[in-house]
C-alpha cells in the first residue's frame, strides 16, 4: 500500500491563520516603537535647544541674541542659516526655525515639533542685542 505523507490543506490553512494572528499582534508594537523613537529624538532636540540657551547665557553673561542661540544649537558641523522668519538650524535631519521678534534678546527658548519640522520660539532679533 502506497501511503503519501505531507500536510493536509486544513493543517496548512491553520498555520497561515496562526502566522497572520501573530503578525497582526506584532505590527502595532513595531509602529509604537517607531513613534516612541521619533518622540524621543524630538525631545532630545528640544533639550539641545534648552541647553544651548543656558550655555549661551553662561558664555555671554546676558541673554543671547537669536543668532547667538542658533550658533550654539548647531550640530553635526551644520551651521545655522538665515531664513525669512529667523534662523534655520538642522539637527539630526529635522529643520528648526529660530523665530525673530523685536526686543533683541532671547529670554527663553521653547520648541514645537510637528513631523520633521519644528519651531523654536525665541524673543530676539537676528543681528544683535
Model regions: which residues?
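A residue-level detector for conformationally permissive "hinge/kink" positions
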Residues: 12-18, 44, 85, 96
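Residue-identity detector for glutamine
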Residues: 4, 42-43, 88
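N-terminal single-pass transmembrane signal-anchor helix
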Residues: 2-33
Amino acid at each position: 500500500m502506497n501511503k503519501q505523507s505531507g500536510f493536509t490543506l486544513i493543517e496548512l490553512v491553520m498555520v497561515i491563520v496562526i502566522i497572520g494572528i501573530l503578525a497582526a499582534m506584532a505590527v502595532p508594537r513595531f509602529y509604537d516603537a517607531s513613534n516612541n523613537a521619533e518622540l524621543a529624538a524630538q525631545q532630545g532636540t528640544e533639550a539641545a535647544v534648552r541647553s544651548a540657551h543656558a550655555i549661551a547665557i553662561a558664555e555671554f553673561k546676558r541673554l543671547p541674541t537669536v543668532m547667538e542661540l542658533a550658533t550654539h544649537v548647531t550640530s553635526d558641523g551644520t551651521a545655522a542659516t538665515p531664513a525669512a522668519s529667523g534662523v534655520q538650524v538642522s539637527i539630526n535631519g529635522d529643520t528648526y526655525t529660530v523665530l525673530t521678534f523685536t526686543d533683541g534678546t532671547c529670554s527663553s527658548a521653547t520648541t514645537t515639533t510637528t513631523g520633521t519640522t519644528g519651531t523654536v520660539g525665541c524673543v530676539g532679533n537676528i543681528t544683535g542685542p
